[in-house]
Amino acid sequence: MAKEMSRRTFLKQGAAAAIGLAVVPSTVLGKKFGYTAPSDKLNILGVGVGGRGASVLKGLESQNIIGLCDVDWKYADHIFKRYPAAKKFNDYRKMYDEMLKSADAVMVATADHTHAIIAADAITAGKHVYCEKPLTHTVYESRLLTKLADKYKVCLLYTSP
C-alpha cells in the first residue's frame, strides 16, 4: 500500500527538486567539453501571454521562450513582438501537438476556468508547470493535478501576485 503524501511534503519536495535542478553547476555535466547542462536554459512555452502572462514571461526572459499562445492576438501582439523567435499559436492544443516535446516547462496564465485542463495536459506529457492563481476551481481538480504531478514526477507551481 502506497503511503499518502501530504500537501506540505509535496510542496517541500517539489521546491527542493526545482532548486536542485536550477543550481547544478555546468561543470558537473561537462560544459568545458562542449556539453551544455540542461540547467543552463529551459525551453518554455507560454499559454495566455497577453495579460498577466506578459509579466510572468518577463521573469523568464533568461530562459528560451520557444512558443507563445493567446486567443487574442491583438491584445498579445506586444508580447509576440518582444519574443520574435518564439512560435505563435492561438490554440494551446496545436502548440502542444507541435512543440511540447521540445519544451521543459509550461507557463499558464489564461482565464481562470481553463487552468486545470491546460496544466493537466502539460503534466501528463511530463512537463513542469507554472500556473497563475487560481490553480483550479474545485478541490477535485486540485487533487487530480497533485496526483498527476506526483505520477509524472514533475513540479507544479502556482502563485498569486
Placement of each model-derived feature along the sequence:
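Beta-loop-alpha module in the N-terminal Rossmann-like domain of NAD(P)-dependent dehydrogenases
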Residues: 86-144
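Conserved small/polar residues in nucleotide/adenosyl-binding loops
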Residues: 158-161
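Loop/turn elements at helix/coil->beta-strand transitions in domains of secreted/extracellular proteins
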Residues: 41-42, 63-64, 85, 102-105, ...
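N-terminal Rossmann-like dinucleotide-binding module
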Residues: 17-83
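N-terminal secretory signal peptides and thylakoid transit peptides that target proteins
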Residues: 2-18
